[in-house]
Amino acid sequence: MNEPVEREEYRPSGTDLAPKLRDQEVGRTVVSARIPLSRAVLVAYAGASGDHNPIHWNERFARAVGLDDVIAHGMLSMGSVLARITEWAADPGAIVDCRTRFTAPVVVADAASGTPDTPTAYLDMAAVVGAIDEEAGTVRLDISVSSGEDTVLGRTQAKVRLA
């Protein structure tokens, strides 16, 4: 029988490593990350999500419908951002609300090397404490997400419960 494997990234809520509500300050950046995207990531996400729209994997089709190239799934972008927030909170159930607007597509070009797992696009994100609700035990994170010069997720916020 296989023994369970403990992932280093996971820190159960309540550990000394989990952020505490009392330590948060409005205006503080709590997460900053660069998230790589490749064609292989898009295909894997399509398989996991069931979203097999060819704009996410077929360059010829994407261009035929007016796009510059293959684009990332919007929910892949949002999910990747929220995964970083979950890691920071050290609790997979800490996000109690989230919202965003998809403002621009994330083009994921074919790698010049021809290797599909080579990243050709990046999501740059920063999460800043926008508000603290001590009574509810939550912080509101205001999150900026861009790819190159484009803001790709707008008005993005997550409400996170902290101990």
Predicted regions and their residues:
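HotDog/MaoC-like acyl-thioester-processing domains
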Residues: 1-30, 112-163
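Catalytic strand-loop segment that frames the active site of acyl-thioester-processing enzymes
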Residues: 3-72
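Generic structural detector for well-ordered beta-strands
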Residues: 34-38, 101, 159-161
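Generic secondary-structure boundary signal with a strong preference for alpha-helix termini
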Residues: 39-40, 62, 78, 86, ...
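Glycine-rich loops and low-complexity Gly/Arg-rich segments
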Residues: 56-61, 95-97, 136, 150-152
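Hydrophobic beta-strand-centered segment that forms part of the acyl-chain substrate-binding groove
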Residues: 65-69, 77-126
